[in-house]
């Protein structure tokens, strides 16, 4: 049953920074990458208007106490994003902070790009700080259910369809290089990529064993035979 509740909360005036965010993105085309992600952020969120966002709770007692108002605690995205700067000395070590901020690059998942390219820069602007120079939103590694599956499915702990890297390493006797090769070969950074163990083994055998492996073996054999190994 749906129960409506009312709760006192502090809000961050996100809407106040919509124009500044639009100008920043326009003047810094490298800020959001890949470029099509920038279009998503602008067209799906900025153009529709930003709503002020709740940043505190008063009905729970876990979280970071709000300064001067201990009845409220800060939670979720607002405090999580601040970790980027408090972890490098903001407010406690100016020399350390100036060494590392503004940062060159955030790499985040596409599902949290909105918070890192619209909310986080607005928070920094409110604090008089410069946003990161670039935020790159990478895609997901989707699990193929079969060889004919061209769309894949997002991995989920609740569904139990996750790939466990340590177990996968045992397939190659602990060597991660075949897995790295597959990911670099098959997946376009920034886009979603499809994974299956069958596809991994097929690529391993066709490229690394039959292709590069055979070429290396033949080349080394000829060097040894005709050039005395030099």
Label every model-predicted segment.
Residues 2-228:
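Structured secondary-structure scaffolds
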